[in-house]
């Protein structure tokens, strides 16, 4: 109550932000008359002037009014479009590192050019991130003339792009690309063996389009570059045969007895599958008969955990994954469907054997499992950018998460024209069939009035079921789903024509614009060498259709079910009512819908049945709407807990990733690492000596023979240590250490002379090779640790603390192994001629190219769903989160006197910084 009174007096935070930016808008508008008078060359020269002023110390904030005025003038001349005042506010929002929520059709793509141009003045590059390759290339091609008029270069990156072309795209002032491509290129750069092989410049500023999709919906899926691992396809086939015979046991209330015992339980809310006692017995018996498990052996014995992993993967494939819902079969391959966008995700594979289990289930060829070579998450990748911003039509419902995870505030940008769309209350039916009948009836009615209708569905399966019913009713329509995505542009272009009916999954929700009367630009583009008369005729026909649709009430949206997230529902609604057009939206639900069945309360179900509803009758009541929104909030809260938890675990790996990648880049950039190698060699030799001659020990405790053998076997250096002791009675522990160390230094210097000029390259290449190999093994070990860490809760231990402790110990082991392995290899390496070196480099490049083509770029199903679930965040843990300022990193490199990111508490130079000298 008190908050409402304060808001009525002072306005909301959003209102105050808009008011502040409004003053800048006034200033930009006043500059317009000055920039109109400039010639094209003078306008282009403004960019060089701005760059010079910025280099001389003038901030981008101070340049903003003039830069925005220049960008608007260039847009007017080149594109024929003048930025609205609200787009100027949106551009400022992006520049300040915030998220701009702007309604569909209000011009987000054009708005982004303002912030992109201003930040490109720094010369450090700007990345504009979109959700798919089509949008990235479309936006880049569309906006290139505008940037060129201002003297800036533009590039776009996409998968399987030639390396030189991609390097040029990253060198451009403004680079367009998908979140996947930017993320994978970052990982690939941190696998490069030469600095010339890296693509990206140091990251500077990113504008993320559809930011809620990328930073929230995609946040739970790690980016993984992987290589092939061992083949176990026969095991998948063998286990797949007996999974269908297993029965589900119903989950009952506490104290009740299940009507029938089953082999597994399924919790649809958390998508978790667990074997029951009876299930374990049946599976162990079946595996024993099949010769996969020894007699009297347990499935939970240490040596059989891999077998258990396969069983759970197969069980999940049959119980949690359904064809035409979570995946489709295309060209004899399992192709995943993005639940948020409805689009296929070609090339993306589930991790931990799930994809292989799906291939076995569908009787397809089983592709080999993979081993992680490099990984990160979008959450951690995008937090590397010193400045991050985003734009979307639906962000306000997730403002809390944006602020607490990414430090990004959401600013709701007002529409240029008032919204004319009518959002009707939901209609709720008892059964799915009754719901479908009502939809068919209303679609027919709207169509008869000349109203275009968009029927939104949540899955391919529902879209096909809806299509069958419209066919039976003889209603012509188009279907847009993951199977028909090739015709997407054509279907969307015609979706706004009078009486057209389009069924679409969520893929029609982003990056698409349904124009009332049809897409005029698409029609004109079809004409070959058109005359003025032909163009005028097409425009006249379009105007007639447009006016007809507007008079009929605009585009009507019918939602066939509510999505888990309110944002997805709002995106569907947002297809109607663009730029002040009329429109209407309504959702048709049933008690059999997944969201209602799983999350809605039993009280609502019993209420609807108790009021005696007739067949085909719908209820439209505020209590029902409230219950649905409550269910959605419940799901959104649960998903936020998952994402927060993943971030907490990945932050541990991310700290280690920062150390490794920082050292790797220092190695690549260094001309030579001789001093670092000398320091590492001193540490390694001291460790080896201490293993056989303990510090502050007496001679009787020394294992001199063991030390001689170790130095000979491991490092190829024969030292007569026992003879030294026999010949010199004065040799004590300290002087002996010095003598051994000096002898090893001399041996290495002889090796350096033998290697000649090649030693500089060899030291770097060996260090990189060993580092990459150990990091790859470390990632695999971290995966295994993460999968089982949830079980520590049963031992009254905090899984997160245990994960941090053990992963730190593993990381320490990695760094020690790195030192020892590098020095051992350098001592034993043989000299090569220049011809041999050139041949080795040629083979390395060929192998790198083969590996690049073999690499799988995939998104794991995160977190490990075969692992025991970790405890969700408690309300107390959530309350500890405090709003952060926009995320700004001090630089890409850890300072030598900064605390080491590994968490040891020591300075970086005294801890892991020692590795790079």
Swiss-Prot record:
Among the GO molecular function terms of this UniProt record, one is: protein-exporting ATPase activity
Q: Could you provide one GO biological process annotation from this protein's UniProt record?
A: protein import
Q: How is the cofactor bound?
A: May bind 1 zinc ion per subunit.
Where does this protein hold ATP?
87, 105-109, 513
User: Looking at the record, which segments are called Disordered?
Assistant: 834-917
Q: Bias regions of kind Basic and acidic residues — which residues?
A: 839-852
* Superkingdom, taxonomy of origin: Bacteria
- Write out the annotated subcellular location: Cell inner membrane; Cytoplasm
- UniProt-listed InterPro entries: Helicase_ATP-bd (IPR014001), Helicase_C-like (IPR001650), P-loop_NTPase (IPR027417), SEC_C_motif (IPR004027), SecA (IPR000185), SecA_CS (IPR020937), SecA_DEAD (IPR011115), SecA_motor_DEAD (IPR014018)
Q: Which UniProt keywords apply?
A: ATP-binding, Cell inner membrane, Cell membrane, Cytoplasm, Membrane, Metal-binding, Nucleotide-binding, Protein transport, Translocase, Translocation, Transport, Zinc
Residues reported in the UniProt entry to bind Zn(2+): 900, 902, 911-912
Q: Which SUPFAM superfamilies match?
A: Helical scaffold and wing domains of SecA, P-loop containing nucleoside triphosphate hydrolases, Pre-protein crosslinking domain of SecA
Q: Which reaction does it catalyse?
A: ATP + H2O + cellular proteinSide 1 = ADP + phosphate + cellular proteinSide 2
Coiled-coil residue windows = none
E.C. designation(s): 7.4.2.8
| Any one annotated GO CC term | cytosol
Q: How does it sit in the membrane?
A: Peripheral membrane protein
Family membership, please give it: Belongs to the SecA family.
> What does the protein in this record do?
Part of the Sec protein translocase complex. Interacts with the SecYEG preprotein conducting channel. Has a central role in coupling the hydrolysis of ATP to the transfer of proteins into and across the cell membrane, serving both as a receptor for the preprotein-SecB complex and as an ATP-driven molecular motor driving the stepwise translocation of polypeptide chains across the membrane.
| Oligomer status and interactors | Monomer and homodimer. Part of the essential Sec protein translocation apparatus which comprises SecA, SecYEG and auxiliary proteins SecDF-YajC and YidC.
Q: What is this protein called?
A: Protein translocase subunit SecA
State the organism of origin.
Saccharophagus degradans (strain 2-40 / ATCC 43961 / DSM 17024)
């Amino acid at each position: 109550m008190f908050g409402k009174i304060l808001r009525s007096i002072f306005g909301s935070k959003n209102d105050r932000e808009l008011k502040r930016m409004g003053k800048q808008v006034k200033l930009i508008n006043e500059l317009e008359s000055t920039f109109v008078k400039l010639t094209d060359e003078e306008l282009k020269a403004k960019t060089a002037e701005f760059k010079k002023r910025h280099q001389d110390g003038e901030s981008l904030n101070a340049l903003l009014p003039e830069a925005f005025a220049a960008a608007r003038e260039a847009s007017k001349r080149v594109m024929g479009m003048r930025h609205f005042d609200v787009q100027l506010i949106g551009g400022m929002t992006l520049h300040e590192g915030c998220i701009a929520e702007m309604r569909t059709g209000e011009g987000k793509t054009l708005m982004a050019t303002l912030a992109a141009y201003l930040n490109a003045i720094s010369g450090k590059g700007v990345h504009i991130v979109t959700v798919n390759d089509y949008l990235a290339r479309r936006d880049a091609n569309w906006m290139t003339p505008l940037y060129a008029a201002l003297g800036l270069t533009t590039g776009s990156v996409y998968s399987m792009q030639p390396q030189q072309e991609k390097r040029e795209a990253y060198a451009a002032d403004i680079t367009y690309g998908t979140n996947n491509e930017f993320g994978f290129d970052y990982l690939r750069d941190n696998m490069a063996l030469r600095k010339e092989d890296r693509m990206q410049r140091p990251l500077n500023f990113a504008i993320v389009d559809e930011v809620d999709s990328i930073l929230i919906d995609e946040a739970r899926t790690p980016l993984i570059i992987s290589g092939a691992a061992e083949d176990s396809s026969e095991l998948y086939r063998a286990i797949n045969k007996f999974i269908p015979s297993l029965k589900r046991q119903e989950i009952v209330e506490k104290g009740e007895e299940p009507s029938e015992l089953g082999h597994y339980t399924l919790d649809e809310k958390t998508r978790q599958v667990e074997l029951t006692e009876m299930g374990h017995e049946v599976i162990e018996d079946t595996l024993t008969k099949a010769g996969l498990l020894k007699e009297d052996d347990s499935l939970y014995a240490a040596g059989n955990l891999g077998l258990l992993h396969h069983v759970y993967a197969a069980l999940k494939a049959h119980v949690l994954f359904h064809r035409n819902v979570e995946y489709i079969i295309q060209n004899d391959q399992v192709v995943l469907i993005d639940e948020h966008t409805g689009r296929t995700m070609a090339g993306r594979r589930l991790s931990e054997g799930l994809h292989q289990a799906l291939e076995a289930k569908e009787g397809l060829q089983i592709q080999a499992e993979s081993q992680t070579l490099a990984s990160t998450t979008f959450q951690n990748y995008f937090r590397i950018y010193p400045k991050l911003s985003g734009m979307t039509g639906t962000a306000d419902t997730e403002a809390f998460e944006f602020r607490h995870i990414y430090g990004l505030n959401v600013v709701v940008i007002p529409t240029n024209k008032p919204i004319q769309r009518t959002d009707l209350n939901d209609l709720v039916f008892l059964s799915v069939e009754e719901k479908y009948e009502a939809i068919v009836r209303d679609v027919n009615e709207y169509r008869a009035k000349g109203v275009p209708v968009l029927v939104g569905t949540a899955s391919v399966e529902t879209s096909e079921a809806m299509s069958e019913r419209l066919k039976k009713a003889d209603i012509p329509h188009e279907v847009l789903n993951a199977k028909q995505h090739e015709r997407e542009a054509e279907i969307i272009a015609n979706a706004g024509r009078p009486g057209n009916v389009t069924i679409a999954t969520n893929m029609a929700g982003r990056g698409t614009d349904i124009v009332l009367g049809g897409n005029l630009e698409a029609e004109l583009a079809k004409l070959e060498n058109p005359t003025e008369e032909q163009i005028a005729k097409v425009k006249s026909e379009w105007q007639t259709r447009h006016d007809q649709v507007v008079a009929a009430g605009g585009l009507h949206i019918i939602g066939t079910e509510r999505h888990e997230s309110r944002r997805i529902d709002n995106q569907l609604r947002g297809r109607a009512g663009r730029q002040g057009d009329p429109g209407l939206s309504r959702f048709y639900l049933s008690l059999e819908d997944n969201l209602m069945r799983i999350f809605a309360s039993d009280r609502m179900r019993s209420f609807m049945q108790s009021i005696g509803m007739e067949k085909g009758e719908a209820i439209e009541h505020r209590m029902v709407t409230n219950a649905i929104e409550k269910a959605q909030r419940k799901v959104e809260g649960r998903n936020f807990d998952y994402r927060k938890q993943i971030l907490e675990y990945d932050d541990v790996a991310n700290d280690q990733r920062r150390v490794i990648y920082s050292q790797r880049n220092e190695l690549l950039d260094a001309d030579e690492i001789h001093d670092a190698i000398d320091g590492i060699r001193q540490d390694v030799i001291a460790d080896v000596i201490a293993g056989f001659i303990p510090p502050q020990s007496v001679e009787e405790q020394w294992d001199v023979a063991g030390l001689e053998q170790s130095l000979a076997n491991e490092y190829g250096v024969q030292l007569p240590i026992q003879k030294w002791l026999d010949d010199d009675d004065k040799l004590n522990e300290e002087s002996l250490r010095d003598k051994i160390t000096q002898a090893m230094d001399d041996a290495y210097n002889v090796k350096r002379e033998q290697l000649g000029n090649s030693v500089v390259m060899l030291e770097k290449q060996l260090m990189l090779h060993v580092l990459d190999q150990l990091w790859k093994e470390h990632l695999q070990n971290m995966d295994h640790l993460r999968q089982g860490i949830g079980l520590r809760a049963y031992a009254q231990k905090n899984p997160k603390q245990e994960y941090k402790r053990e992963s730190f110990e593993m990381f320490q082991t990695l760094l020690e192994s790195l030192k020892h392995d590098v020095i051992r290899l350098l001592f034993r390496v043989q000299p090569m001629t220049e011809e041999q070196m050139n041949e080795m480099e040629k083979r390395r490049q060929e192998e790198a190219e083969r590996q690049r083509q073999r690499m799988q770029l995939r998104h794991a199903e995160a977190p490990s769903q075969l692992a025991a679930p970790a405890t969700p965040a408690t309300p107390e843990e959530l309350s500890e989160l405090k709003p952060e300022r926009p995320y700004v990193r001090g630089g890409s490199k850890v300072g030598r006197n900064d605390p080491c990111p590994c968490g040891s508490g020591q300075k970086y130079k005294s801890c892991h910084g020692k590795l790079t000298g």
